[in-house]
Amino acid sequence: MERVLIVNADDFGLSKGQNYGIVEAYRNGVVTSTTALVNGEAIDHAAQLSRELPALGVGMHFVLTLGKPVSEMPGLTRDGLLGKWIWQMAEEDTLPLDEIAHELACQYQRFIDVFGREPTHLDSHHHVHMFPQIFPIVARFAAQRGIALRIDRQTVLNADDLPSDLRSTQGFSSEFYGEEITEACFLRILDASTHRGEASLEVMCHPAFVDNIIRQSAYCYPRLTELEVLTSASLKAAIAERGYRPGSFLDI
């Protein structure tokens, strides 16, 4: 059975170092797709690079934890900025869901304005779209527009909660992350998906070159390690040997 493998690089538009790392991992490695933060400092640079790479699938990385929102969000921001206090608000069930739904629509329109096309799919920074209060908003939004959505089926949900016309991969992994990033780790993810009988799999990654913005991230130098692994010729060969076809969310 042929299996579709989507290797999606998150954080396109975060910084020029991030952008160049993603492009390097696409041109000379196994990355096939990316998702862009429309409020990122280097989003225009990302859009410029993407125009030179029309086959690179570009989706939208919905942001509720970093930087300035596109719309006014007095119920979620502090001093005009988004932040990780969203976790506490989710636990207390005090999320401003109307503001979040409006911000999603505004970020989506901003993506179209910057990239000149609709995103191939949606996911989110720090996986906030998987919060039980937020997931129905994002799932409905994606289904209405006919675009795919990253779904971590281990954290949500039974299938009855999903819109019938919502597209996603059968499998998703965030395990290629952290301090122990190796080719063996990547291949274990593929082998586990094969064992589950999944016909499509998304693997999340964050390849980057380190610049001043990336240095401010709690997840900094492992991004360079990811880039090294993802551009390994032996990894590309091992993926092909396992019967995976590289693809984007347009292939599911």
Swiss-Prot record:
Entry binding sites for Mg(2+): 61, 125
GO biological process, one term: chitin catabolic process
Pfam families: YdjC
InterPro entries (alphabetical): COD_ChbG_bac, Glyco_hydro/deAcase_b/a-brl, YdjC-like
Pathway: Glycan degradation; chitin degradation
Single GO cellular component term: cytoplasm
Catalytic activity: N,N'-diacetylchitobiose + H2O = N-acetyl-beta-D-glucosaminyl-(1->4)-D-glucosamine + acetate; diacetylchitobiose-6'-phosphate + H2O = N'-monoacetylchitobiose-6'-phosphate + acetate
SUPFAM superfamilies found in the cross-reference section: Glycoside hydrolase/deacetylase
Compartmental location: Cytoplasm
Keywords: Carbohydrate metabolism, Chitin degradation, Cytoplasm, Hydrolase, Magnesium, Metal-binding, Polysaccharide degradation
HAMAP family linked: COD (MF_01246)
Family label: Belongs to the YdjC deacetylase family. ChbG subfamily.
NCBIfam families assigned to the protein according to its UniProt record, in alphabetical order: PRK02134.1
Function, as annotated: Involved in the degradation of chitin. ChbG is essential for growth on the acetylated chitooligosaccharides chitobiose and chitotriose but is dispensable for growth on cellobiose and chitosan dimer, the deacetylated form of chitobiose. Deacetylation of chitobiose-6-P and chitotriose-6-P is necessary for both the activation of the chb promoter by the regulatory protein ChbR and the hydrolysis of phosphorylated beta-glucosides by the phospho-beta-glucosidase ChbF.
Official protein name in the record: Chitooligosaccharide deacetylase
Lineage start: Bacteria, Pseudomonadati, Pseudomonadota, Gammaproteobacteria, Enterobacterales
